[in-house]
Amino acid sequence: MTIRSLFALLPALASLGIPALGEEPRRIDLRTKAGVESVKGEWRWHDVTLVPVAGKNPDGSPNKTYNYEPRAMAADYDDSKWEVVAPETLKDRRSTGQICFCWYRTKVTLPPGVEGKRVFFQTVVDDYGEVWVDGKLPYKVGQAGGNVASGFNYPNRVELADPAPGKTYSLAVFGINGPISVTPTNWIFLGPTFLEIVDRDEK
């Protein structure tokens, strides 16, 4: 490819939300139609309901407690009947307010240009978020951030394993309204949400 033809491609790459060679930051904005289309994605949303279930006390005796539905973390979870969300509306408030939870789901297929790179998914959930990638939410004692919540309106930043052009990942973001103990007067929405492609020695 000649230098002239390379420069001719730059406007097309920009229109798709795909970072051009040497461009900083190298991000694909998942709150734009162009960005989502460039990774063959589609956002879907669903509210979460608390449901009563049988449980156990610490001594093993039975009690009544709560779980939630839908449990939509699996990579192959069928969300085909969920509401399809336009990327530009991810910033809009959703769910019921007060004590509430919800899911945002999409799949992303990595574009050319990720060879030898690291790829991160990052989002900010108003107010707390947990991020499942391909049905997994790894965590450990003392962990702050990554797949689990680390603070109020604080970014979740998760590295996508073994990136390669054409590889698809399932992303499921569990949104939590907060602070829970004050009975929040707001709702749930997504702040800046993107894929970031960085060199191997960057974080």
PLM regions with names:
Residues 98-111, 154-157:
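Short beta-strands within extracellular/lumenal beta-sheet-rich domains
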Residues 1-5:
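Positively charged n-region of N-terminal signal peptides that target proteins for export
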Residues 19-22:
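Boundary at the C-terminal end of the N-terminal hydrophobic targeting segment
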Residues 8-17:
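Bacterial N-terminal signal peptides
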Residues 82, 108-138, 171-175:
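Aromatic-lined ligand-binding clefts that engage carbohydrates, nucleic acids, or primary amines
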Residues 24-68, 82, 155-203:
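An acidic-aromatic loop/edge-strand motif
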Residues 133-156:
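Solvent-exposed beta-strand/loop surfaces of large extracellular or lumenal domains
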Residues 99, 114, 151-153, 162-166:
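Surface-exposed coil/turn segments at beta-strand junctions on protein surfaces, enriched
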